[in-house]
Amino acid sequence: FNGYFPEIGARMTTCSFKETEAYSVCGRLNGKHKDKVLVVASAGNTARAFAKVCSDNHIPLLLSVPEENIDALWFEAPLDDCVKLISPRHGADYYDAIKLSDMALQSDKFFAEGGAKNVARRDGMATTVLSAVTHIGRIPDYYFQAVGSGTGAIAAWEANLRLIEDGRFGNHKMKLMVSQNAPFVPMYDAWKARSREMLPYDDDQARLDVEEIDAKVLSNRKPPYGIKGGLF
């Protein structure tokens, strides 16, 4: 179990399963990045998880989070000064936060976390499936998740394939049941059209749709959808 529900053993104090990826990503850092600052763009919950883990372990971190999503950055204790924050102004969305983080990455003082392409991020999130399977005793028939980038669903699928290779928990593949928050549904629209490529989405309309949804963390306009190994 993930999130925060101590009665059933879930003790992630950020209340987000994104802690699973923050620990694995930070644990995989090596000397190559010594004296450099890790950069993470986020719509909110990933930033909260990385801020906690980096603060607790004194890992220099630069977060890029849309100004409208800053209320997602709550913590049970003050953060260490090694964690810094930049934000695109009011009216911007997650994609704008990514572009702002890319500007910082033009300096050799910073390095990118990597997002869905970082195997440590996917393997970290995959632990939710590994934990479920070892408790249930078999690979589930269905996997449900709300998605912004779809990285969690990709991670779940990769875990499923490894469990099949392991052989102790069955040989079937879960049906991934992923959802988005209307009216911001770019992956749903592409899937419905059976298109590997994301459909055209006007930037201004996308920002308006993001303002309307409740789940701001699901607002990735450029998800790893059509790439090889992506959600499609």
Q: What are these model-predicted stretches?
A:
Residues F1-F232:
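PLP-dependent amino-acid enzyme catalytic core
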